[in-house]
């Protein structure tokens, strides 16, 4: 993950490769993303956090990137005034950059996710939002893991007005963002199948005992997997996840 030594792993080639495979399969028709207002983002993310990303990205010199380097371990009640220092107040790691394009790209990813959500809410059985940057590590007031806005959570929040929503996250890393955003809610089920946080990013969340809080107890399901497992064991874990989703009986699955 550490981009300074290994190169930037979240790159446009990922979008091109996935789109090429989908077009070859012939299951989807490509439609352009609609534009949605910033209020769709602030329904999920803290407005102060959103304003920070917008301001900070606009001030980074062209061709440069800003990485967080100081973190509020001792005092989280006083956000630093300097924008470059404040990156550490809002970021969960040291390798997710802010630059001139990050905020605009994150807005575009949200628009794409909401376009897919709107299509499904309007009657489409299936929609695939091909987005970058990704989003599942972004919490209500934090970015990281190359994620700035939580596209999945924003789509789920929009769909919630039309029925029950379940989120199934099968990325190798734990979906800490949607867990944190919906942790005390029972109207959105969050299920994550991922490498165990003992050895996998983001390390500090994704444990099996994290089941929700308050009204959300039982509506957050983590299925951490060992470092080594075969296909059979993975399929059994996936079946457990799917059974939990089915028991919730959602109107929409994100």
Language-model features: locations:
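HDAC/HDAC-like amidohydrolase catalytic core signature
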Residues: 1-254
């Amino acid at each position: 993950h550490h981009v300074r030594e290994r190169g930037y792993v979240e790159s446009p080639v990922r979008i091109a490769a996935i789109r090429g495979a989908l077009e070859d399969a012939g299951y989807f028709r490509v439609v352009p993303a609609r534009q949605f207002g910033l209020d769709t983002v602030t329904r999920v993310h803290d407005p102060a956090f959103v304003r920070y990303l917008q301001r900070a990205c606009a001030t980074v010199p062209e061709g440069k990137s800003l990485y967080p380097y100081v973190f509020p371990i001792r005092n989280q009640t006083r956000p630093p005034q300097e924008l470059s220092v404040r990156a550490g107040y809002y970021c969960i790691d040291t390798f997710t950059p802010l630059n001139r394009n990050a905020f605009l790209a994150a807005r575009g990813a949200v628009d794409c996710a909401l376009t897919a959500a709107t299509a499904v809410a309007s009657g489409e059985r299936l929609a695939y939002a091909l987005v970058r940057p990704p989003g599942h590590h972004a919490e209500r007031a934090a970015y990281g893991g190359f994620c700035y806005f939580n596209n999945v959570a924003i789509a789920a929040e929009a769909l919630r007005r039309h029925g029950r929503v379940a989120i199934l996250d099968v990325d190798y890393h734990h979906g800490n963002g949607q867990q944190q955003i919906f942790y005390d809610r029972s109207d959105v089920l969050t299920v994550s199948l991922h490498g165990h946080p003992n050895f996998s990013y983001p390390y500090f969340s994704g444990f099996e005992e994290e089941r929700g809080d308050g009204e959300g107890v039982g509506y957050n399901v983590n299925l951490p997997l060992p470092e080594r497992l075969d296909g059979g064991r993975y399929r059994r874990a996936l079946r457990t996840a799917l059974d939990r989703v089915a028991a919730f009986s959602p109107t929409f699955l994100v």
